């Protein structure tokens, strides 16, 4: 049994397979998952696990070069906006796009990790960086 990192075998596999600029979505429970994009559904019940908790866990094991958020989070979800700002301070480039554009960009993702988050616009597209 693994002692460190992600115990979820699908998440561990996806993170290990990511290459430079590949994208991974962390989503709330309402984001539509595009057909053909792998979904790892972590949702247990409304609010669990949360978006930020899940994002923090992924970021502990993932080199994020760029993060894309829906611009609507600035007005409707201050916690997500605050997290975006902290990611920028840690060195990730940020993009903000309309929620409709965000959903279109999800079609190119390697996978979507669906959380139980039930606050608006709690979604991010993470683009993989390199560790060297």
Curated annotation (Swiss-Prot):
Q: In which pathway does it act?
A: Carbohydrate metabolism; D-ribose degradation; D-ribose 5-phosphate from beta-D-ribopyranose: step 1/2
Indicate whether Transferase appears among the record's keywords: no
- Give the enzyme's EC designation: 5.4.99.62
Query: Which residues are the active-site ones?
Result: 20 (proton donor)
Entry keywords, A to Z: Carbohydrate metabolism, Cytoplasm, Isomerase
Describe the task this protein carries out. Catalyzes the interconversion of beta-pyran and beta-furan forms of D-ribose.
| Family indicated by similarity | Belongs to the RbsD / FucU family. RbsD subfamily.
Query: Quaternary structure?
Result: Homodecamer.
Stated name of the protein: D-ribose pyranase
């Amino acid at each position: 049994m693994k002692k460190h990192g992600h115990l979820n075998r699908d998440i561990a596999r996806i993170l290990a397979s990511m290459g430079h600029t590949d994208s991974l979505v962390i989503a709330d429970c309402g984001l539509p998952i595009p057909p053909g994009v792998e979904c790892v559904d972590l949702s247990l019940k409304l609010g669990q696990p949360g978006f930020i908790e899940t994002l923090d866990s992924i970021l502990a094991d993932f080199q994020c070069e760029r993060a894309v958020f829906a611009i609507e989070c600035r007005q409707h979800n201050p916690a997500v906006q605050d997290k975006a700002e902290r990611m920028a301070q840690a060195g990730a480039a940020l993009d903000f796009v309309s929620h409709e554009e965000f959903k279109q960009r999800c079609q190119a993702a390697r996978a979507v990790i669906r959380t139980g988050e039930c606050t608006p616009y709690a979604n991010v597209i993470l683009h993989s960086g390199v560790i060297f």
